[in-house]
């Protein structure tokens, strides 16, 4: 089978006189994309076999002409541009409904969940709380929509009118470790402070030091008011948050002599010998409990995993 390269660099054509079937394999020769010029194709010296490099997977489609193979430009790999921190803005999701779908994808990338359920949850955002905030970068090109690079949810706190509970804090994976999480938290603190709130609460499993660097300290559990008709009492909330009650210590065996029933026949048995001094002495007092390590917590989430409650006055 003969292969001919056409003048267009993005097309691979077959000799019109010979149009046998074109098969794609994944283990012999390789068809790779030039990283400098993506539409250009490079072929290995072997002509009869055409394969894709597993490191780059642009989708390929056959055009109606049976002898033409083209790249679909709509499926080219897209990289998330790195925005500048001063250009980022915070906006409530209910003020930008056209970005709700992109926000749902961002959250589901971290915590997979039904898309319909996620969109429904985001649709509950309102100025009356709970309120979902998006961290947005400016339009990458004129006329394009902003890019959602972060999200956080704010809810009122039961019995604490000047507090908010921060939940579902997430930053796009390619942008983590570059200051976008700090920018998101500082922005929502300013957002809450401007509306009269004075304290923020949150929970974390593995970001204790990140929040500690932002000024958060270990705190007590609180309940966010997501739906007013499903409020839990403070007693029930603390019952779920407190660690299980410690088991009572095992009782020491009674070493004193017990009365032995007398036999109806024969003389009574002699009394037992006295116990050794080492067994009758009282045990030494237990040492004072050690202070709790910063990496330990007595609270558990609904799955039983350790969780840290933190708070900060703003």
Curated annotation (Swiss-Prot):
Source organism: Mus musculus (Mouse)
Biological role: N-alpha-acetyltransferase that specifically mediates the acetylation of the acidic amino terminus of processed forms of beta- and gamma-actin (ACTB and ACTG, respectively). N-terminal acetylation of processed beta- and gamma-actin regulates actin filament depolymerization and elongation. In vivo, preferentially displays N-terminal acetyltransferase activity towards acid N-terminal sequences starting with Asp-Asp-Asp and Glu-Glu-Glu. In vitro, shows high activity towards Met-Asp-Glu-Leu and Met-Asp-Asp-Asp. May act as a tumor suppressor.
Residues the entry annotates as binding acetyl-CoA: 169-171, 177-182, 207
Annotated GO biological process: actin modification; N-terminal peptidyl-aspartic acid acetylation; N-terminal peptidyl-glutamic acid acetylation; regulation of actin polymerization or depolymerization
UniProt domain N-acetyltransferase: residue ranges: 90-243
Region (Disordered): 260-295
Enzyme Commission identifier(s): 2.3.1.-
Protein name as annotated: N-alpha-acetyltransferase 80
Gene: Naa80
């Amino acid at each position: 089978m003969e292969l001919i390269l056409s003048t267009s660099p993005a097309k691979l054509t077959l000799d019109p006189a010979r149009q046998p079937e074109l098969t794609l394999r994944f283990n012999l020769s390789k068809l790779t994309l030039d990283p400098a010029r993506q539409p250009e194709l490079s072929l290995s010296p072997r002509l009869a076999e055409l394969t894709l490099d597993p490191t780059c997977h642009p989708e390929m489609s056959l055009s109606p002409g049976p002898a033409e193979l083209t790249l679909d430009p709509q499926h080219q790999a897209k990289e998330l541009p790195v925005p500048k921190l001063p250009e980022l803005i915070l906006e409530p999701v209910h003020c930008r409904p056209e970005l709700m779908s992109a926000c749902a994808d961002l959250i589901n990338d971290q915590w997979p969940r039904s898309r319909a359920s996620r969109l429904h949850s985001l649709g509950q955002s309102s100025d009356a709380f709970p309120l979902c905030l998006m961290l947005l970068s400016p339009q990458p090109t004129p006329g394009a929509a902003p890019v959602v690079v972060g999200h956080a949810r704010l809810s009122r706190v039961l019995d604490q009118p000047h507090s908010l509970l921060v939940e579902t804090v997430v930053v796009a994976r390619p942008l983590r470790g570059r200051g976008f999480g700090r920018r998101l938290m500082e922005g929502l603190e300013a957002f809450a402070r401007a509306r009269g709130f004075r304290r923020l609460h949150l929970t974390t499993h593995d970001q204790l030091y990140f929040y500690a660097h932002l000024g958060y300290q270990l705190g007590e559990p609180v309940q966010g008011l997501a739906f007013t008709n499903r409020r839990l009492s403070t007693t029930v909330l603390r019952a779920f948050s407190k660690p299980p009650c410690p088991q009572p210590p095992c009782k020491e065996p009674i070493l004193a002599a017990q009365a032995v029933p007398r036999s109806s026949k024969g003389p009574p048995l002699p009394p037992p010998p006295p116990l050794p001094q080492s067994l009758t002495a009282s045990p030494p007092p237990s040492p004072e409990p050690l202070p709790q390590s910063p990496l330990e917590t007595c609270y558990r989430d609904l799955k039983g995993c350790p969780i840290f409650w933190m708070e900060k006055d703003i």
